[in-house]
Amino acid sequence: MAYSYTEKKRIRKDFGKLPPVLDVPYLLAIQLESYRNFLQEGKSLAERGELGLHGAFKSVFPMVSFSGNAALEYVDYRLGKPVFDVKECQLRGVTYAAPLRVRVRLIIYDKESSNKAIKDIREQEVYMGEIPLMTDNGTFVINGTERVIVSQLHRSPGVFFDHDRGKTHSSGKLLHSARIIPYRGSWLDFEFDPKDCVFVRIDRRRKLPATILLRALGYGTEQILDTFFDSTRFYLKRDGFEMDLVANRLRGETALFNIADANGELIVEEGRRITAKHIRVMEKSGLERLSVPLEYMLGKVTAKNLVHPATGELIAEANTELSVDLLEALVSSGITEVDTLYTNDLDNGPFISDTLRIDPTSNQLEALVEIYRMMRPGEPPTKESAEGLFQGLFFSEDRYDLSGVGRMKFNRRLGREEDTGAGVLDNDDIVAVLKTLLDIRNGNGMVDDIDHLGNRRVRSVGEMAENQFRVGLVRVERAVKERLSMAEADGLMPQDLLNAKPVAAAIKEFFGSSQLSQFMDQNNPLSEVTHKRRVSALGPGGLTRERAGFEVRDVHATHYGRVCPIETPEGPNIGLINSLSTYARTNSYGFLETPYRKIVDGKQTDETVYVSAIDEAKYVIAQASANVDAEGRLVDELVQVRHMHETTLIPKEKVNLMDVSPRQVVSVAASLIPFLEHDDANRALMGSNMQRQAVPTLKADKPVVGTGMEKNVAKDSGVCIVANRGGVIESVDASRIVVRVNSEETIAGEAGVDIYNLTKYVRSNQNTCINQRTLVMKGERIASGDIMADGPSVDMGELALGQNMRIAFMPWNGFNFEDSILVSERVVEEDRFTSIHIQELTCVARDTKLGPEEITADIPNVGEGALSKLDQSGIVYIGAEVEPGDILVGKVTPKGETQLTPEEKLLRAIFGEKASDVKDTSQRVKTGTRGTVIDVQVFTRDGIEKDDRAKFIEKSQLDQVRKDLNEEFRIVEKATFERLAEALIGQQAEGGPGLARNAIITEEYLANLDHPEWFKIRVANEDASEQLEKAQAALIERRKELDAKFEDKKRKLQTGDDLAPGVLKIVKVYVAIKRRIQPGDKMAGRHGNKGVISKIMPVEDMPYDENGDPVDIVLNPLGVPSRMNVGQVLETHLGAASKGLGRKINEMLVVEREKAEAVAELRSFLGEIYNGYEGDLRCARTEDLDSFTDEEILTLASNLTGGVPMASGAFDGAKESEIKRMLRLAGINESGQVKLFNGRTGDAFERPVTVGYMYMLKLNHLVDDKMHARSTGSYSLVTQQPLGGKAQFGGQRFGEMEVWALEAYGAAYTLQEMLTVKSDDVNGRTKMYKNIVDGDHRMEPGMPESFNVLVKEIRSLGIDIELENE
């Protein structure tokens, strides 16, 4: 098998038994693809689909004036180049965006001509604001900060049928309802009331009888009845009544009279229930009509209007109940046939007929007016306005759109064949929905499950941005229509008509402040990836935390392989915010799909298909772990499968699909937990969430027990440097890698050099440190896609969030009570959990009413010592070690001038202007922060003189740019001439400097020739001469390009910065803080086993084993059984085996002997580790160690001395017997337990203790960020009580329960002190402070300010209250 550069250096032993069917897809695809479809950049007009920007323009344009004489049409758009690149945007605090230019055409028609002849066409490109661009890693830079747009899981447009689960009415009756949800436009609801009438609501307003809507659509009473009911025909005769017999309709009824066949034989006697058997007899007997008594006819309802045959007079309207009087009238008027509605209580309810009776309207106009009154109460309706409103609600393309998804879901739910159709509704749609609702009420059909993932779809960045853009365009449209009428006369151009501001504002609002545009979680690479793969049910058009019930939050059968059942926050958002599963993707409609492998006749095929939740129920899907033989045939006769969202056993022949991987169920974070299958779900949830909070440590350390997903996360997160093209490392240092590209991957004439610049010590969103370290050495060969440099929390191309610690499960003097963690001093000494945090401190100089603030080293009333770290501009030096209270940027602000006395005025006049009053408002280091200044940035407003420091920074940056560009050119030039030499040496020359005709060009000749002279050589070979020309052109072009780049950079640096109004200068100081681990810091494993460090013990006091090796961490064994996360114990055992194997390999390397002998022994031992197995536990992956050279084997072995990395993936991990085999190989006791000795006394502990290696994380809940103390500080304005919280430098709340405690103790004076001088007795606390300064500790409590507030509030209610003086 092919190994990547990093894999060859350190192979992870994989215990997986199932061969991989499908590689893990690119993890950020959902973000990148969605936005790519939105921009459709680089596509020609013909290639662009009707979606994204193009779709938004097409849907709003053309904009036609009110008179119809002028129109503005959309032609095309293009995106310009962004002004600043991503890094510059982050530094300057601006948005990374590209200008959008739209080509529009203004068409003016001739008013006079009848057939709208075109009078004038004006076409122009109009600037429409900036569109933020996505970076390569799926983020946006908005105002200098990286943000992520989270995808939203919302209810799909379409039609849904539901009932209230019996909650509305006291009887517990199920009230059914139907709701048509469009993508945009008014909602239409149909619902039953407890009396079984059907009502309609538009946009959740007041309800109206549903037949009003049908009348408004143009249906009359007869039509409505004909549409929703079957009819039964009765024949009226003088001597009685007959009816057409449709035998089936009588099923289940009680016979009110004897039913006999033509021969007079009794079929059903009176009072008996008619059964299926009776119906069969009736059908056989050939009866067509039945004689019925009068009682049977009473209460039946007429289906049509009944008119007197002679006079044409209306005797009875349709939907009238038959009574004795009415029947007599009908018979006497000579009517012989009456059609009645066929209804029964079982499956044909009279709902529409009942609704017609309560319908106050009788024709279309009345119905339209009724709807108008409901939508616009208080406005007088006219015929036109009522018609216009109703048309606009559901039938106008501008106001209503089901969208492609909505139409597909709508048609599928109503059982139609085609998936496409109009975006607006028509009469058939509304009638079909009503019919389906009635069917469900009649017991034919089921209501929908709204939590089914076939009814919820994902809206990603691109779609949300498009909607927002459309909103902006619609706002513009109103203004344009008004201006268009003027355009005819005034000769305006498109530019004068279109105002880009509303569009830009809509986009800015969406990216800047939408609920789904979130500040990127950048703690570590995993948290970045997870944030981009998050799916939220909250946000605009979604749910709210308060209203979401249990069902929405719960795990659903359709989540399988689409949404992770484990990873979701604890707390109020549980189940509303989810994570995509590893293999999930969205289809063109926005529904989540998951891949399955096809099974044909019980045999696996290589074909994989993606299936959405809508289609999944019909398939029979086997687990990935189903038993198969060598040829891929299912072995078991009965296979455990999922079918119709249930798990059952089914014969193997019926299986259609099979999971592609056992980890397709879980998300990326959950798939990083080894032995996940042995952990309780609640703890696994905490484990996945806590991995995202791990702080990158100083030295990343790969997990010895992993899952094999680490490399995918590291590569896809974008924090590493990945080779775009293969080649040889030309040069490498800490800040750049230069690759000479393989000749087969280059284009002719190109230099074939790739230069990668590394990110060094940059602050992340969470103040952690982003730093890249190179892995490659000069001269090494790499392939495209190899990782060349590690990022934060990455070790050799694998995600490394924490450290492998030697742990023991045992109690130790109560120091690990309640999940506390006891840590050895060695851990601190070796800097295992030391992390670097970078804080950005900003000082802003503004223009105030009293004059400008000034950044200067000349600060009033500050000693020399405090200024020692500042330069002459008043800004701290880089490299200065700063402590709390140190000045970073000296700044003075003008103070309000006091009114001068005449004497002062005179003195000023004599001695000249005294330095006007300024106060010190310098930026100082906050309490609790001490570190080193690593960078300073100065931004100056345009038109203001730059200070010396700004000029110095600018010069050094320019020098660096010039140096980089020159270096780049030198590398390119060298590579070009080396390629040319290959092409020229040995060629026959036709001439050249110092060359005879037909001479052969030698290496020596070229070595003595100056480079510019090479291009004068003429050669016979056409290819070589063409290469010479191309190379010369390419070099000249490259030089030009680099010069242009330099000039561009210079221009950007020298022009002033675009700062907020009123801001003159901004100085940003970056301070790096080194945080060692200390008591109070939170740590965790990957199995939800979290705790706080209680004490850091000297190494000599820690328990040690028989070899004298002390453990690093002592954990409480009681944390395991009740929490049921046994995965951590298995990890500990396998970790011990891994480290033991590493030790053995190290011993083999250390022994001095012949190299060949050492390599042979290592080869066989590594083969035993990687490819050995017992019984039938054969791992799917075997390592091809024979393909490794001796050198490579030695490199591999030396990288394994710290422990052989193992992978135990989710649901396909190491079995107990395999762990025991590894322990045996490592020469460790199979029980994994060790005899330990007390470090203090040297006595052995009573029982053996489980000791091994566990991967521990340090979480971003550091005690340094939480420690806080205050003596005096700021107070709240109204109550005069101290503020709360560390950020406000607040006090500790002394609440009512604390007051009760002091009352219970009878500590009256302490209580008085708490409620007065320590809180809000303004005079008392001032006196107290003064007394303490004087060394006098008496207190004189007065009236608390909050009591005065209470008095004032009572007075504001009009109640007089005053204090009596004793």
UniProtKB/Swiss-Prot annotation:
Family: Belongs to the RNA polymerase beta chain family.
Function: DNA-dependent RNA polymerase catalyzes the transcription of DNA into RNA using the four ribonucleoside triphosphates as substrates.
Keywords annotated in UniProt: DNA-directed RNA polymerase, Nucleotidyltransferase, Transcription, Transferase
Entries under Pfam families matching the protein: RNA_pol_Rpb2_1, RNA_pol_Rpb2_2, RNA_pol_Rpb2_3, RNA_pol_Rpb2_45, RNA_pol_Rpb2_6, RNA_pol_Rpb2_7
InterPro entries to which the protein is assigned, alphabetical: DNA-dir_RNA_pol_bsu_ext_1_sf (IPR042107), DNA-dir_RNA_pol_bsu_external_1 (IPR019462), DNA-dir_RNA_pol_su2 (IPR015712), DNA-dir_RNAP_su2_dom (IPR007120), DNA-dir_RNAP_su2_hyb_sf (IPR037033), RNA_pol_bsu_bac (IPR010243), RNA_pol_bsu_CS (IPR007121), RNA_pol_bsu_protrusion (IPR007644)
Family matches, as PROSITE patterns: RNA_POL_BETA (PS01166)
Catalytic activity: RNA(n) + a ribonucleoside 5'-triphosphate = RNA(n+1) + diphosphate
EC number, as in UniProt: 2.7.7.6
GO cellular component terms listed in the entry, alphabetical order: DNA-directed RNA polymerase complex
GO BP term, pick one: DNA-templated transcription
Species for this entry: Marinomonas sp. (strain MWYL1)
EC category name: transferase
Record-given protein name: DNA-directed RNA polymerase subunit beta
GO MF annotation, one: DNA-directed RNA polymerase activity
Coiled-coil blocks: none
UniProt-listed SUPFAM superfamilies: beta and beta-prime subunits of DNA dependent RNA-polymerase (SSF64484)
Subunit structure: The RNAP catalytic core consists of 2 alpha, 1 beta, 1 beta' and 1 omega subunit. When a sigma factor is associated with the core the holoenzyme is formed, which can initiate transcription.
Lineage: superkingdom: Bacteria
